[in-house]
From Swiss-Prot:
UniProt keywords, alphabetically: Chloroplast, Isomerase, Plastid, RNA-binding, Transit peptide
Organism per entry: Oryza sativa subsp. japonica
InterPro entries hit by this protein: PsdUridine_synth_cat_dom_sf, PsdUridine_synth_RsuA/RluA, RluA_PseudoU_synthase
Plastid keyword on record: yes
Main location: plastid
Protein name: RNA pseudouridine synthase 6, chloroplastic
Record Gene3D superfamilies: Pseudouridine synthase
Residue ranges of every copy of the S4 RNA-binding domain listed in the record: 98-205
Cross-referenced CDD domains: PseudoU_synth_RluA_like (cd02869)
Length: 477
């Protein structure tokens, strides 16, 4: 007879960017009248019973829905859907020694082949001990966490002997469906991984710029990920390029560009070169040039901002130095007037207009990237009122600042605030002006990359950017 699982939500702090109170239905689901939870308690307090399973369901922290939310019919992860399913992340603690695929399939009522696909995609993580609940977790969640991490329980775990609790709480990917799970092992299952359908539309061999003994240079298509997502390492540039070239050893990432950007990416063939290239990037020995299609002209010269040191979008930048914020610099080498992309080109490439009216002209900027912060070019150009065409995340904020310059608390016309609470509210209001991350392409290309290595100069250029392509020649029609 299958073992019972008791519901538990919100165990993992890193899944939430901002504190969100658990929806009311979670409290109902975890009430003491739940027969599922009563079985959980009985098993935990029975001297002969093994550690019970704690199943955590976090479909989406902000969704107001009944506890019995309707999920799609699960079969296989392929073929790839064109749209992502709503987020669904499940947290489990093994009740007894188990096989990963069997335990997940039974606990979440998922087909074993679907679970095996999730594991192949890198969407399943484990830790020897369940992580600490976030501060906003419900008391019931905290109670169950304490029960499964009781010192008297942990001291019987052979796998964690010699480890600190913090070490035992470190998560790793499950890589084998038949991986054995010791009783008490924690699992995080991303049931609906982020998908990248564009991967299946690309002629990957045609995107390869160069192949050497140490690396491959790829002209990365937009709407793809260089190395994959937290819950999907399968649909990525490294995997599809490796397959296209027939490589026995998969390529490795050396640096990143945004999913919505296109252009030059260096993928390493060996761990040694990967380490060398990382070192060259740290020492600023790798030169990167970009082309950006902006809504207005940008003056040549160096542009400096300071970026908030918080690792989530949107990336906020300030014209004034703020202690602890990271310096961001780029040099505008050239800016020329070009035709605004035609409606056909924008339709072919699925460019979001973001509510920005079509113009007669756009402006193509050649940029020398002096520092390499995430979203740096996009955030800096938006901050000076010249956002990148199609950038739904930052263009909406730029439009808001054009209408009301004082809305940006870090801009030139930012207000003085009487209290920290007032400033915090202004920052949240400014964040809310930003849109969602683009799902397709924006007017940004990593056009050139170069470096010196072992006495040789290496330099590569990407192809024609999408906004200059003839729609008839596009491979997307």
């Amino acid at each position: 007879m299958p073992k019972a699982a008791a519901s538990l939500a919100s165990l993992l702090p890193q899944l939430w960017h901002r504190p969100v109170q658990p929806p009311p239905f979670l409290h109902r689901a975890l009430s003491s009248s739940s027969p599922l939870l009563r079985r959980h308690r009985a098993a935990l307090h029975s001297p002969a019973a093994p550690l019970s399973a704690a199943a955590v369901s976090t479909s989406a922290a902000t969704v107001e829905a009944p506890a019995t939310a309707a999920y799609p019919v699960y079969g296989r992860l392929l073929p790839c859907p064109l749209q992502d399913d709503p987020p669904r992340i499940e947290h489990l603690v093994a009740r007894e020694d188990e096989v990963a695929v069997d335990f997940i399939s039974r606990s979440l009522t998922l087909p074993p082949l679907y679970v095996a696909d999730l594991i192949k995609f890198g969407a399943v993580y484990y830790a020897l001990v369940a992580p600490q609940p976030p501060p906003h977790a419900a008391p019931e969640h905290v109670r169950i966490f304490r029960e499964v991490t009781e010192p008297s329980v942990l001291c019987r775990r052979k796998s964690i002997k010699g480890k600190t609790v913090r070490e035992a709480q470190k998560t790793f990917r499950v890589t084998d469906p038949n991986q054995r799970l010791e009783a008490g092992t924690y699992l995080r299952v991303h049931v609906h991984p982020k998908r990248f359908p564009r991967c299946y539309e690309i002629d990957w061999k045609s995107r390869v710029i160069a192949v050497t003994d140490n690396y491959v240079v790829l002209d990365k298509p937009a709407a793809t990920s260089v190395g994959g997502a937290t819950d999907n390492i399968e649909e990525s540039c490294v995997v599809f390029t490796s397959r296209a070239l027939g490589l026995e050893t998969p390529l490795m990432t050396t640096h990143q560009i945004d999913n919505c950007s296109e252009g030059c990416v260096v993928l390493s063939k060996t761990k040694e070169f990967c380490s060398v290239f990382h070192g060259m990037i740290r020492e600023k020995q790798v030169n990167k040039r970009y082309l950006a299609l902006t809504t207005a002209p940008v003056s040549t010269g160096i542009i400096t901002h300071y970026m908030r040191p918080i690792n989530r979008a949107p990336r906020l930048v300030s014209e004034d130095h703020i202690k602890g914020w990271h310096v961001c610099q780029m040099e505008i080498l050239d800016c020329k007037k070009v035709p605004w992309p035609s409606s056909l080109i924008r339709k072919v490439h699925k460019v979001d207009n973001c509510g920005w009216p079509q113009q007669e002209a756009a402006y193509e900027c050649k940029i020398n990237l002096l520092t390499g912060k995430t979203h740096q070019i996009r955030a800096q150009l938006a901050a000076i009122g010249t956002p990148i065409v199609g950038d739904s995340a930052y263009m909406t904020a730029a439009m808001a600042a054009i209408v009301n310059p004082s809305i940006n608390p870090f801009g030139r016309w930012g207000q003085n605030y009487d209290s920290e609470d007032e400033k915090a509210a202004a920052v949240e209001a400014w964040i809310s002006c930003h849109g969602k991350e683009p799902k397709s392409v924006i007017g940004l290309q990593a056009s050139e990359i170069s470096w010196d290595y072992e006495g040789e100069h290496h330099s590569y250029k990407a192809g024609v950017p999408w906004w200059r392509q003839d729609a008839v020649e596009s491979d997307l029609i």
